[in-house]
């Protein structure tokens, strides 16, 4: 069958830069699904995306669907004809649906009976007849949160559409996409190259767009080029560029013909904390800051223009002129904020609500102060410094700098606290209280910082759960999932001796009578244990391993971590599978039995050698394992328990647990209960698959 390259390009107004890549990838995935559903063979699908276009190029696409044989089984012969041999209504209705008469139907004969059968060869449709509908379907399924209408049309898309091009090889595919008829004309760069030109063959794309339209349509090519040029520009300045992937992606999505330029600002602005300057350069202007080899911010920045200008200095001057007022604002705010102490902002916190039912930010500050001190005492951190950090924790939210540059919260608190002469670990905690901010982010570095970070997160969890506003589905307006996982990561990775139950109880107690959910403590603990499950799954731990540990409901995160790792190691032992199966068998036996068990095994009632041997082993192991359990050495404990395999196997091979003698039966059930209890000190390994 003949194959050709298929091209579709949708020319638009400027698409949302933060969504551009995801739109293009979804377009490709959706169209691949359309091709699969249509039973069309195809090769590689390449996607292209610029601010003003989305495009797909499909290699080796079949010109038509393959012919296929269709079989439709009808009613059984007994139901298809009446006693006179005439077709029944059921048979006639089925035949009509197949486009034949009942008399024209074939017969399907099997060992189970005889049925009417329709068999036909369906000729595959030409791909040219299908492509427009498939493109429309793929576009309609794109994840676009807000759709736009334009002109007087009912069509909706992320941005107004101006051109559509669909080519199968050199043949134009006629059709209407998003209200626009397909044509050979595509548009070039707004200010360079040819504004419009015709494309003759799908194979010419994207090279023709680069040559005639001065547009680099390949997203990855643009991204790599920008990164390389920014790095080289920084080297020429004698520094290193701050190239975060998120900013690089956004800049790539903003330009069609990237030209990297360098600019500068006055040295005096470097007296302002670097974080504030970087915030406005990266967040507002999409510039790349530059640092010297010592990690200090330089008075230079790198930006990407969307034009190859004959006078680049004019573009540089324009960008320097734009950024200067923003940096001057930061300088003014910094100087103004330092005219009073950070602590002087406390009364203003009373004017800002944390949550209507939970009080103001000042109320939250008081709770965090108390909880941070309580946590600090538990983990051996400086209690006075922790309570001081708690008191100052939200004061920077009232400063001019944070009001204008919101993402500098925390870090500006740190700088202002240092200016006020606060202890260094207090100042550092004001910045680190929000860590970890995202997956893989660094954790607070000191005990005081850990105490404050956990206190802030637990106060939010207790409060929001306490008024019944826990996350539902994808909705999590208070970022409780992130708060829970952040607290857990700190406790686990810093190996802090904190218990979720008592920690939550203390956080709840500090709210007084504000909370309406009587089950708030249990709800928060269960929620956090649920985040454990998700976190460990993401790290590659098996679901049944996590469930085996969760069955014991350990509320100390560090203890939970030790158990998961111990069970994971246990699974590598040769004895693991047999002992897991034995525990499952024991669980089933005990669940079905109705007898009341003894407090302990009666040695005098033991008869069979195998049960005597098992009981003896358990007595020895109980003494040996006690200190291991006490110290949380679960891996060593499970290795010791693995030695029971042969004894347990021999017991089940030779001993009848449900003996007719009630005393013997109860004693054996008690023995099995003691066996299971030893494993349950770590996890319910009967749940292992």
From Swiss-Prot:
Protein name (record): Glycine--tRNA ligase beta subunit
Any GO MF annotation of the entry: arginine-tRNA ligase activity
Protein's UniProt keywords contain Aminoacyl-tRNA synthetase: yes
Catalytic reaction(s) noted: tRNA(Gly) + glycine + ATP = glycyl-tRNA(Gly) + AMP + diphosphate
Coiled coil stretches, renumbered: none
EC number: 6.1.1.14
Disulfide linkage: none
GO process annotations (BP): arginyl-tRNA aminoacylation; glycyl-tRNA aminoacylation
Compartments reported by the entry: Cytoplasm
């Amino acid at each position: 069958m003949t194959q050709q390259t298929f091209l579709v390009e949708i020319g638009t107004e400027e698409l949302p830069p933060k969504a551009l890549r995801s739109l293009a990838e979804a377009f490709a995935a959706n169209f691949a699904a359309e091709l699969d559903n249509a039973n069309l063979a195809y090769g590689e699908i390449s996607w292209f995306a610029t601010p003003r276009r989305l495009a797909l190029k499909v290699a080796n696409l079949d010109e038509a669907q393959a012919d296929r044989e269709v079989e439709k089984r009808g009613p059984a012969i007994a139901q298809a004809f009446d006693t006179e041999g005439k077709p029944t209504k059921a048979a006639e209705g089925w035949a009509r649906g197949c486009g034949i008469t009942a008399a024209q139907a074939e017969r399907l004969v099997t060992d189970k009976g005889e049925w009417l059968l329709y068999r036909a060869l369906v000729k595959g449709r030409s791909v040219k007849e299908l492509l427009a509908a498939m493109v429309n379907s793929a576009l309609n399924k794109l994840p676009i949160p807000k759709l736009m209408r334009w002109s007087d049309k009912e069509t909706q898309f992320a941005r107004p559409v101006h051109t559509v091009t669909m080519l199968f090889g050199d043949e134009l595919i006629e059709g209407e996409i998003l209200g626009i008829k397909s044509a050979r004309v595509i548009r070039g760069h707004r200010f360079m190259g040819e504004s419009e030109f015709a494309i003759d063959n799908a194979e010419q794309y994207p090279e023709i767009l680069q040559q005639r339209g001065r547009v680099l349509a390949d997203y990855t090519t643009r991204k790599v080029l920008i990164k390389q040029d920014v790095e080289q520009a920084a080297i020429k300045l004698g520094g290193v560029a701050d190239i975060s992937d998120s900013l690089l992606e956004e800049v790539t999505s903003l330009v069609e013909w990237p030209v990297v330029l360098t600019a500068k600002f006055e040295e005096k602005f470097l007296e302002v904390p670097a974080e504030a300057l970087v915030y406005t350069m990266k967040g507002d202007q999409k510039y790349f800051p530059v640092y010297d080899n010592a990690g200090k911010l330089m008075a230079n920045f790198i930006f990407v223009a969307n034009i190859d200008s004959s006078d680049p200095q004019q573009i540089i001057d324009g960008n320097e002129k734009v950024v200067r007022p923003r940096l001057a604002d930061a300088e003014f705010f910094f100087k103004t904020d330092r005219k009073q102490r950070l602590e002087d902002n406390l009364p203003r916190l009373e004017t800002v609500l944390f949550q209507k039912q939970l009080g103001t930010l000042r109320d939250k500050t008081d709770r965090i102060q108390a909880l941070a001190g309580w946590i600090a005492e538990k983990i051996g951190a400086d209690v006075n410094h922790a309570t001081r950090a708690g008191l100052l924790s939200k004061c920077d939210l009232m400063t001019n700098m944070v009001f204008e540059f919101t993402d500098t919260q925390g870090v500006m608190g740190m700088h202002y606290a240092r200016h006020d002469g606060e202890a260094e670990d207090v100042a550092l905690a004001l910045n680190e209280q929000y860590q970890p901010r995202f997956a893989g982010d660094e954790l607070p570095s000191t005990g005081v910082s850990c105490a404050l970070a956990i206190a802030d997160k637990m106060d939010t969890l207790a409060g929001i759960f306490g008024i019944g506003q826990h996350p539902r589905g994808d909705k999590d307006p208070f970022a409780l999932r992130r708060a829970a996982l952040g607290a857990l990561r700190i406790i686990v990775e810093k190996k802090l001796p904190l218990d979720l139950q008592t920690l939550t109880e203390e956080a709840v107690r500090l709210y007084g009578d504000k909370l309406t959910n009587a089950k708030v403590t249990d709800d928060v603990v269960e929620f956090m244990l649920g985040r454990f499950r998700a976190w460990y799954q993401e790290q590659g731990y098996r679901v049944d391993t996590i469930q085996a540990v969760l069955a014991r409901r350990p509320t100390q995160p560090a203890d939970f971590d030790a158990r998961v790792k111990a069970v994971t190691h246990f699974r590598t032992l040769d004895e693991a599978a047999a002992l897991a199966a034995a525990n499952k068998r024991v669980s089933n036996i005990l669940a079905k039995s109705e007898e009341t068990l003894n407090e302990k095994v009666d040695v005098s009632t033991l008869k069979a050698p195998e049960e005597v041997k098992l009981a003896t082993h358990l007595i020895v192991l109980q003494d040996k394992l006690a200190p291991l359990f006490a110290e949380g050495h679960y891996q060593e404990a499970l290795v010791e328990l693995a030695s029971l395999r042969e004894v347990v196997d021999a017991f089940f091979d030779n001993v009848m647990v449900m003996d007719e003698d009630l005393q013997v039966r109860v004693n054996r059930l008690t023995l099995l209960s003691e066996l299971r209890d030893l494993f349950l000190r770590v996890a319910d390994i009967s749940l292992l698959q």
